[in-house]
Amino acid sequence: MQNFWCKNPQVAAEAVRCRWPKSAEHTIFIADEICRGRYLFQDHWEMEPTHTAVDFGAEIAGIDWAAVPFGDPEWLYAMNRHTSLVNLAKAWLYTGDDHY
């Protein structure tokens, strides 16, 4: 499946970093926030952008997967679509840092 999109993901990641550095930096920022346990949905496909992060703490066991912060049920749906995994994977490709 990987080769369906590109033969070398590292080359694609480098191209993004060179051509759209602000996009790569934003992805890395979001991934860093996720690693801290702070969730902020700002990617255009997730939901209406959120401006206040919800902080569950850095331990994954502390995440409340049924939380509805600010009374917004769309937040719950966005959280459980696990798009955070996409941002973590992209940050890893951009940086090579295994903590993602």
What spans do the regions from the language model cover?
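Extracellular glycan-targeting catalytic surfaces
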Residues: 1-100
